[in-house]
Amino acid sequence: MEPLLLGRGLIVYLMFLLLKFSKAIEIPSSVQQVPTIIKQSKVQVAFPFDEYFQIECEAKGNPEPTFSWTKDGNPFYFTDHRIIPSNNSGTFRIPNEGHISHFQGKYRCFASNKLGIAMSEEIEFIVPSVPKFPKEKIDPLEVEEGDPIVLPCNPPKGLPPLHIYWMNIELEHIEQDERVYMSQKGDLYFANVEEKDSRNDYCCFAAFPRLRTIVQKMPMKLTVNSSNSIKQRKPKLLLPPTESGSESSITILKGEILLLECFAEGLPTPQVDWNKIGGDLPKGRETKENYGKTLKIENVSYQDKGNYRCTASNFLGTATHDFHVIVEEPPRWTKKPQSAVYSTGSNGILLCEAEGEPQPTIKWRVNGSPVDNHPFAGDVVFPREISFTNLQPNHTAVYQCEASNVHGTILANANIDVVDVRPLIQTKDGENYATVVGYSAFLHCEFFASPEAVVSWQKVEEVKPLEGRRYHIYENGTLQINRTTEEDAGSYSCWVENAIGKTAVTANLDIRNATKLRVSPKNPRIPKLHMLELHCESKCDSHLKHSLKLSWSKDGEAFEINGTEDGRIIIDGANLTISNVTLEDQGIYCCSAHTALDSAADITQVTVLDVPDPPENLHLSERQNRSVRLTWEAGADHNSNISEYIVEFEGNKEEPGRWEELTRVQGKKTTVILPLAPFVRYQFRVIAVNEVGRSQPSQPSDHHETPPAAPDRNPQNIRVQASQPKEMIIKWEPLKSMEQNGPGLEYRVTWKPQGAPVEWEEETVTNHTLRVMTPAVYAPYDVKVQAINQLGSGPDPQSVTLYSGEDYPDTAPVIHGVDVINSTLVKVTWSTVPKDRVHGRLKGYQINWWKTKSLLDGRTHPKEVNILRFSGQRNSGMVPSLDAFSEFHLTVLAYNSKGAGPESEPYIFQTPEGVPEQPTFLKVIKVDKDTATLSWGLPKKLNGNLTGYLLQYQIINDTYEIGELNDINITTPSKPSWHLSNLNATTKYKFYLRACTSQGCGKPITEESSTLGEGSKGIGKISGVNLTQKTHPIEVFEPGAEHIVRLMTKNWGDNDSIFQDVIETRGREYAGLYDDISTQGWFIGLMCAIALLTLLLLTVCFVKRNRGGKYSVKEKEDLHPDPEIQSVKDETFGEYSDSDEKPLKGSLRSLNRDMQPTESADSLVEYGEGDHGLFSEDGSFIGAYAGSKEKGSVESNGSSTATFPLRA
């Protein structure tokens, strides 16, 4: 594949070079030459709507040409001051101002120098007038219902194209159909009018897009009078009009669109059909439009000329019209005259041929004048050629060939330059070239020489010119070196020589390494809907890396750059990824590399695997009572061999429509003999399997029905259902419909006591259950069940042992003792129940126990029975998870499949003391530079008499080392806090607290805190403020500093604050202002009013709290929930609020401005004096051992606030 692509790229490059090398001779601008027009306006220029219009004419030549114009064949001078000529060209502009209609006409540009004159084609400049409908009074039209009528439009003339519309005054289009039609001229035809056609606002609009103009005809009124007798009539052509006769001629230019239209009046409305007389309408280019009234043929050719017939018909008759179509063509070049360069004394021919219909006439001009005015000795002028002999420099001229017929004129200029000059090499000296090893190199040496010159190439270090099959020199001087090697690198010289002189240039050639590619993985096999990942590894010459571009294609079609199908295909440079591959993604993938000098490619074959197609054409043969042959045809395997076939059947009377697997067949086989059961109406289907998965099932086969037979098997799983004592309910698995083998299925059940010398009892039933009464409880029986149907009995059944129904145990176990293992675990032992008193199959023993009272406080406990079962025959069991230091009652009973027997007499035992649980909380409520005060809550479960606490602490500064653990035994169990002294300043400590009983200490609760620094000023304390006070003076040591003020109740739990604020004191220069205000009478009165109101609110608050009023805990929990506090909430004594984790509702800014919402803010209570009583949620006093909160701020339903003006 790679050589193929390389070769293809080489061919394209060679074709480009050949076109480059075979172009017309380009005379260097330094050589004298006749003028050549290189740019001109279109042959028709319409008046534009821009600020000016421009007619272009540009030419080249040596000497520089001068320009002149003619208008309508007469010289045109730029005398009008509005004309703006361009420098160095013949282009001029006319501003769009004033009256410019006199500029309309046909212009021609002439470019001349001393050697000749070139002329442009005629440029028609059109200044259209603004089209208008004439102002006229249009008489109303009145017709009878069913009559035909034509509404004329007669649009004004204007610059084409013209678009005509019929609308009403509301600019709604008049609906056209088989009855109503607008002709190409714009007239509106009615084949027969109806009453609904009456209206007074039929308006014809003419639109001229190039003029950006739409004009409207005066509205027309049409009245349709209803008629009681509408006469039907045969068709009559209205278009073409009657005066044109039964046939007409139309001339159309080749390549244009032919439109033939036919419209007939009549009632019922005639239908129009088209045909070509003596031929067929051109397929693919003809269409019938406007309900068949218009025949449209696009891109008309000479084959379309001839006679076309339209036929309008209804059931009363027909009307026809023939169109004779003539196809003509404006002139077009078949041999356009070509410019040429000749040397003195040479000969030449100038050819000019054109075709058209009618045949164009040819006229020759020399320098814009008829050729007859410029006779040259030896020249022969024919209608289609001029023959030159012994050319001389004075033959240099511009020859014009003009071809014309009735449809237009075309003009071509051909320069004849007679010059003698030594070679002029156009390629720059010292040009650098590069190619790739194995590719061809092209070294250019473009030149101009007259007379003709000889070109030779040689390597700079060599004397002889290059020769051999690897070298080729083109006519324009380019050297081609085929199949380059590294030895071809170097400098080359190009020599060009003619009769007048010799010239040379040098060129340098570099040889690069070829680009290489490798696509991986090679030929992958990908399951459908998996991901395909291809990688393209490239290697190229270091000089070419900047130009290296990779692209991907599939089966020769390139992928888009950014992928397709909503990102399913992603191309990222060298990587191609396709998600959810489908069978359409299978193919040959090619990675192509292109550099500035070469290209390379590599391919990989991607195979997509899928499940097979379903098998087809299922056929049944060799039909037998117990077998049939099934044959099928394999479907497509989708690139993965079929490993096996699964044959399924449907025929189960119990589950119709359910398919079951019958057998499996190896993938190479497509036929199998299927074993069948009697009395089944079978239908089969086949599923193919390959490594990807299963196919869809095939279409079902024909039905095959087998005859009935006696049962082949007996019921299985014979058992006893739970039943009453002295009763045996025998059950078994009934035979499925596929196992019954025939109609009338029944079951013969026989039984007898096991080992008893009695006859078998027997009963036949149709269902799969039989109830048998027995004289004994839980006695063994031999039981047999046999299947029978109308065709006979099944095989002899095997006997099974079943037991009659159980009864409850009638004796309770006797408890021998309860051994206490520890405070929460005991071992119970009992005597087993005799087998004959179990009355069934013993399943185990059950222990019931319940707590009667706590030994800690002596309170009785409501009976809540706990149950623990032990399976099997045993006489002891362990009872865990008991409460320590408590009294329990315990009973034991036996149970079988029927149920539980009687309980034993209750056994009373007590559990000893255990270790307590951890305290409910531990917090540091006060800290200084060398002391700390800790407070804690009572454990939720004491598990005995509390003897005290073990407090431990150690230094845990932010290092890997920790300090020595210090122990403090607190022997006062009622003490809820402890004051530590002799701590280090600015040090972080970790505290551990355990509650203890006589059995030891429980799990610790921990807390961390840091002491203050040496320079800390601590907390300023204020003496008590009574309820009637509204202000209190505070001495401030630093005027202008911020101070935190918190107001607390004296005896509330944890010294909860009811107000806090951050206040900035002023400097001393403002002290007088506050002194003066405080002595004013109005200020004293205001403060008294505020104090009275505050006292009233606080009194209400305290009364509500003492009466158990609830404050909004839920509201505060919703503001800032704390998951850690929430998890602990249910484990503490009683209820408590975590509102200390949230700011007080209605309070001002936080004490610590940097504190996060979920952090706890320190309260002044941490630094308060003495112990503080605790309140429960309802505000009542609990005492030292009541449930407590870690931190809290009390919120009442109507919270009070207080202000504290400071005086500096």
Swiss-Prot record:
> What processes in GO biological process is this protein linked to?
adult locomotory behavior; axon guidance; cell adhesion; cognition; exploration behavior; negative regulation of neuron apoptotic process; neuron migration; signal transduction
A Pfam family reported for this protein in Swiss-Prot or TrEMBL: fn3
Positions carrying Phosphoserine are: 1147, 1160, 1180
Listed transmembrane segments: 1083-1103
Residues bearing glycans: 299, 476, 482, 562, 580, 767, 822, 945, 1026
Record-level GO cellular component terms? apical part of cell; dendrite; extracellular exosome; membrane; neuron projection; plasma membrane
Positions bearing the site annotation: Cleavage: 753-754, 1039-1040
Segment forming the signal sequence: 1-24
Q: Where is the Ig-like C2-type domain?
A: 35-124, 128-223, 235-328, 331-417, 423-510, 515-607
Q: What is known of its domains?
A: The FIG[AQ]Y motif seems to be an ankyrin recruitment region.
How does this chain assemble?
May interact with L1CAM. May interact with ITGB1/ITGA1 heterodimer and ITGB1/ITGA2 heterodimer as well as with ANK3.
Q: What is this protein called?
A: Neural cell adhesion molecule L1-like protein
- Whose protein is this, by species? Homo sapiens (Human)
Gene that encodes it: CHL1
